[in-house]
Design a protein with these regions (language model features):
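Acidic, metal/ion-coordinating pockets
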Residues: 1-358
Length: 358
C-alpha cells in the first residue's frame, strides 16, 4: 500500500479556535490534513506554564491546554528541534513533550540527553516502516542537548567571514563572503543516524530547521548538507524555519523542501509581549506558504507535491483559491527552476515536483 505524509512549516499557536473568525478554507485544509497517513510539523513554542524566559529578544509560549488545538490539523508527529521550543527552558520543553504525547502527537527532536534528543522515530504505516530523523541548525545558547544535558537535537554550524584583500584594496568596504559549514562531529552523527536507519526502514524522512528567517536566500551549508543526507539514504529532506516559501529540489530523485513558509503564525503582537522592533519582524512575515505532500508508492518511490496555502490575519492557515494558489506556485517554481533545475507541474489540486525539462 502507499503512504501519504503531509509536512508543514512552523507552528506558533497561541489562540483558541473560538478566538478566530470562521473561514471554510481553514476547515478544508484541516480535512485535507486529516486524510493523510502522517502529518509532520515543527512545533516552535512550548505549551507550558512552567519555566522562565530565556535571555533572548524573542520568547513566546502558549497556554498548556492549547495543545489540543493542534488535533484538528491532523498532527501526528511534532519535531521540537528548532530555536524556540526551548524559550522557557528544559522544564517547559519537557512539559511540552509530555503534553504533545498526551494529545496523541509523537514528539521528536528533544530529550533528556543528546542520544534521547536525536533518537529517530519509526512508524509502521500501511505495511511500511517510515523513519523520522530530527535536527535543528538554529541553536540558542544552551539549548543543544549534550551527553549529560537535556535539550534539542542540534547540528552546530560554524561560520567564517572570508575577506579578499585584493578586493578590499580596490573597493574598500566590499562585504565579506559568509562561509558556513556543519560542525564535523554533529554532521557525522547525523549522517550515521540516517545510514543506520535506512538499513532498518523503508523510507527515511529528515526534518531539519535551518537557514535564516526571511526571503529566498539560503545559507551556504544547506544544499550540500541536503545532498549528503540523501546520499546517506534519506528518501526526503524536509526543511523549515524561513518565514517565506522557498524552492524545492529533486536530487537523485529524492525531494528536498528548503522551507514551505509558516503554517500557524500567532506570535503575540500586543505591546505587553512585543516591542515595536519585534512587531516589525512579525509584520515582515510572508502570508504565502505551502504544505508538502510526500507520497510513497508500493515500491518505496517518493514523490513530492506542494499545495499552496496562506496564513490569515489571525495566523491560521487556509487553502487558497485557484488563482492565488497559482501565484504562490509561480514563485516557488521560479526559485526551484533557477536554483535547483526542478519544475512544478499542476497535479491533483497541487503542483508536482519534476526534473526541469521532464
Amino acid at each position: 500500500m502507499s503512504v501519504r505524509i503531509v509536512a508543514t512549516g512552523d507552528i506558533v499557536l497561541t489562540k483558541s479556535s473560538e478566538d478566530c473568525r470562521d473561514d471554510p478554507r481553514v476547515g478544508a485544509l484541516q480535512r485535507m490534513l486529516q486524510s493523510a497517513d502522517v502529518v509532520l510539523s515543527s512545533v516552535e513554542l512550548p505549551f507550558s506554564d512552567l519555566g522562565h524566559p530565556s535571555d533572548r529578544v524573542l520568547n513566546f509560549r502558549a497556554r498548556p491546554e492549547l495543545v489540543r488545538e493542534l488535533v484538528p490539523y491532523g498532527l501526528t508527529v511534532a519535531t521540537l528541534a528548532n530555536n524556540h521550543s526551548s524559550d522557557y527552558g528544559w522544564v517547559a520543553l519537557d512539559d511540552t513533550r509530555r503534553r504533545l504525547e498526551g494529545a496523541g502527537i509523537r514528539a521528536i527532536g528533544a530529550g533528556a540527553d543528546r542520544d534521547a534528543a536525536e533518537r529517530p522515530l519509526v512508524l509502521e504505516v500501511n505495511g511500511k516502516r517510515i523513519g523520522f530523523v530530527p535536527r535543528t541548525c538554529l541553536i540558542p545558547l544552551g539549548a543543544a542537548a549534550g551527553p549529560e544535558r537535556p535539550g534539542v537535537a542540534a547540528v552546530h554550524i560554524e561560520t567564517a567571514w572570508e575577506v579578499n584583500g585584493e578586493y578590499q584594496l580596490e573597493e574598500p568596504g566590499v562585504p565579506p563572503r559568509i562561509r558556513t559549514t556543519p560542525r564535523a562531529e554533529d554532521r557525522s552523527r547525523l549522517l550515521e543516524d540516517v545510514r543506520a536507519l535506512a538499513r532498518d526502514v523503508d523510507v527515511v524522512i529528515v526534518s531539519i530547521h535551518w537557514g535564516w528567517g526571511f526571503g529566498t536566500d539560503m545559507a551556504e551549508y544547506q544544499r550540500p548538507l541536503a545532498h549528503e543526507l540523501i546520499e546517506a539514504g534519506a528518501g526526503a529532506v524536509l526543511g523549515h524555519h524561513a518565514h517565506a516559501p522557498q524552492g524545492v529540489e529533486l536530487y537523485r530523485g529524492a525531494p528536498i523542501v528548503y522551507s514551505p513558509g509558516n503554517f500557524i503564525a500567532q506570535q503575540p503582537r500586543d505591546p505587553e509581549h512585543a516591542t515595536p522592533e519585534v512587531i516589525a519582524i512579525y509584520e515582515a512575515f510572508s502570508p504565502d506558504a505551502y504544505v508538502s505532500v510526500i507520497d510513497i508508492d508500493e515500491a518505496g518511490e517518493v514523490a513530492l507535491r506542494i499545495v499552496p496555502i496562506e496564513t490569515e490575519p489571525d495566523g491560521r492557515p487556509a487553502l487558497l483559491g485557484d488563482e492565488d494558489a497559482a501565484a504562490v506556485a509561480r514563485h516557488v517554481r521560479s526559485e526551484s527552476r533557477r536554483r535547483f533545475s526542478t519544475d512544478l507541474l499542476p497535479d491533483n489540486g497541487g503542483f508536482r515536483a519534476v526534473p526541469r525539462g521532464a
